[in-house]
Amino acid sequence: MNDCAYQTVTNKLTDYKVGRGKWNLEVTKETVQELEVTYSAPAAMPAIEQNLIPKKDDTFVQFGNFGSIKKIIQSRLFYPTFITGLSGNGKTFSVEQACAQLGRELIRVNITIETDEDDLIGGFRLVDGSTVWHNGPVVEALERGAILLLDEIDLASNKILCLQSILEGKGVFLKKIGKRVDPASGFNVFATANTKGKGSDDTIHWN
């Protein structure tokens, strides 16, 4: 009981006062030299070259406005095209097979209400401890002169307004890295939708 007397407990607590930021550590010369070594993050892995030409499907049967789509792609002219029609009637598949038959690269982007500039144009990504700029699918298509397919574009929000200059054939300025990307020869944009929206009726309607 005597060990639990008030004065005894108070004395013991006084002996074990906690100091702020105080550590009793032994630092050797080797430790100091090790701490002084400058850490250099490894470089980001280079992008892997990919073949983006779709595979031909032997079961595909040409129908509807497939001939018009194929001619537009074959011309290699910038002629952005909006294709509408019921869900599942071959809008996307026809663009893919036209590219497959013509040996043209295709980059497909599935659009949702959450799709934003970072998803489309690109942004910084964390790679091995460093922030590295990664091109989005739109910039990739611009640089490669590929066909860009924006699937289900009628589901998009106003976040895709970043595509306005690209749809005018003027390329895009990447403000985050101060670089301008102009469309390479052959670049074109196709967009598909299940509805015609409230814009122009000048579209390819898929029956």
Where do the model's predicted regions map?
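Charged low-complexity interaction tracts in eukaryotic proteins
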Residues: 3-40
